[in-house]
C-alpha cells in the first residue's frame, strides 16, 4: 500500500492541522480511504495513490491557512475535506490561493466551496452581482469581505451596507431613540461581518469619517453613489419600487452586490419582492451577474445543510 509522510516544524504544528482532534483524521479515512497517523512533527498517510494526493493537498491547504494567521478548527477541516473529495485538488488550490485581504491585522477570508469561488469571481468581473440562495451560504459575509478589500486597495472610497428594516415597515420615525439605536437591530448581521474582518477601532474611525456607512434601505433614496461598494442584504424583503430605487443609485466607479433568500420573504401580502422581479428581469443583462447558491454551499453547522434539503423536499412534494 502506498504511503507518504509529511514533515512539519514540530508536533504542535502537525496537530494544529487537524485541530488536535483524532476524529478529524478518522473522517479523512472515512471520506478518502486514507489512514493518517501523527507523531512528533509528522503526519503519515497510507492509502491509494489518489487518496494520498488529495489528503496531502488537504494538509497543504490547511497549513497555508495557519501561516496566514487563520484558525484551523473542525469546521475548516471539514470544509477543506469536502472540497478535496467532491471538487478535487485543483479546486482546493484555487480556494486556498484566493485569499481576500480585508485588513493588515486580520488573516483574510477565503471561499469554502466552488459556488462561493464562482461568486467572488462574479463580483470581481461585474458592476452588479446578485447572490441568491439559502441562509448560511456566505452571500453577505463574502460580499463584505470583497467590499473591505476594495476599500483597502483604493478601488473605492467608501462602503455602504444596507438592508430593508421590514420588521418596522421602514417606519423608523415611529420608534423611540435616536437613529443609531433604531437601526442597530436591523443591521446587526452586517456589523457582525465587519467586526470579523476589521478591528473595532478601525470600524469606528471609518464610520465617523463616513468611509463605512450602515443604513436602512429607505435612506438610499435621492442619492447618487459614486466610487462606492454598496451591499444590499436581505433583498428579498425589498419591494419592487425599493429595488429599482436602489439599483439606480449606482454612480461612476461603483460596484453593487445584492444578496437574499427568495424563500424567506417577510413582506405583507400586498407587496411584491423586488429581488424576485430583479432576478427574473435582469439575469441576462450585460454587466450584471446572478449567482445562485445551493445547499451544497452552506458552510454553517452540517445540520443546516440537511435542514434545507428536508424543507426543499417537503415544498417540492406539496407542489406535486
Residue ranges and their predicted role:
Residues 1-16:
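Short glycine-/aliphatic-rich beta-strand segments at the starts of folded cytosolic domains
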Residues 2, 6, 70, 88-96, ...:
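Intrinsically disordered, low-complexity mixed-charge segments
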Residues 13-30:
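Short amphipathic alpha-helix segments
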Residues 26, 32-41:
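Compact, well-ordered interaction domains used in eukaryotic information-processing assemblies
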Residues 37-96:
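Interdomain "pre-motor" coupling segment immediately N-terminal to P-loop NTPase/helicase cores
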Residues 42, 106-114, 118-232, 236-320:
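Conserved helicase motor core of SF1/SF2 NTP-dependent helicases
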Residues 96-108:
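Conserved adenine-nucleotide phosphate-binding loops and their immediately adjacent elements
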